[in-house]
Amino acid sequence: SGKSYNLQSLTVGTTEDETISRMTIGVSSDDITFEQIKKQLNSMVEVIKVIDLTNVPIHMKEILFAKVLGCNVEQKAEIFQIAQVFGVQVEDIGSDSVLLECKLTERRNNELIALLKEKYKRIEVVRGGAVAIESISTSCR
């Protein structure tokens, strides 16, 4: 029908079978558009199966790197505390910068970015797409 939509996230990687890749696609759309997207994906010859994880318990994480630039010693100590609270890794440290590696839910990553933007003048953020798998017992969105 020519309706357009925007991908929020796209991640592709090999699976336990090296001849098969798994694609995790994140979209925000109305129900009609979402059904259209699923139909389009299912009609592609290379697609083995489309799994809709909208209403099932899942585990989902997104990788993110956040670099805080131009920080002094006190700010670096504060960033270490923030990293501890959020459960993220301090990946690298420079004389006036700190690099954080985050593997959190999209919502938690957004909260971290908002906090860093609020507290520090110069930050650089790189996000990878989310990956998701159906949960065995609990959900982590």
What residues fall within each predicted segment?
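Long, contiguous binding/interaction regions
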Residues: 1-22, 29-141
